[in-house]
Amino acid sequence: WKEHAAIPGIARVQPISAPLEGGLLGVWGGFAPKTETKPAQLAMNGASYNAGCGTWTSLPVPADAVGEEVFTGGAAAIAVPQKGVVVVGGVNKDVFLAAINKLPEGYLLHEPEWYRFNNKVLCYRQGAWTQLLQHSSVARAGCALAYWDGWVYVVGGELKPGIRTSEIVRFRVD
């Protein structure tokens, strides 16, 4: 193992990452937990790492079709040939940030819709984000992704905190 330069900005617990064009590593999201002196913080932006020269470069914040910023904490990412990096699921930035700073009473008792997990599939390619689709079946946190023959498979994940599914769904990306 060899330690490389740290990602600039706040510490990032649970970021997502995937390889980018040009042999770079892309990293987005994550959060810095609260401490005795600071509230928790979300990392909305991304950064690409060039291992050849040991440098990080800022990447744009993921955004949906209407330009709203999307937090990628709890999401999953996969590199898809000729498409870019596909990002699925994740937690809602406002609900999550409030919970990690001060867990409200009854937090785990709500219906899945209350948590507003991300139901959009985003794609990062050549410096820009696009929204590929929106569907309730991808509103999951902590799912796994696989790509095969033009399809992205979304495997398992949480439908709400503490409630997991074994369901597998897929969508075309070509």
Question: Language-model segments: which ranges?
Answer:
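Kelch-like beta-propeller repeat domains
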Residues: 1-174
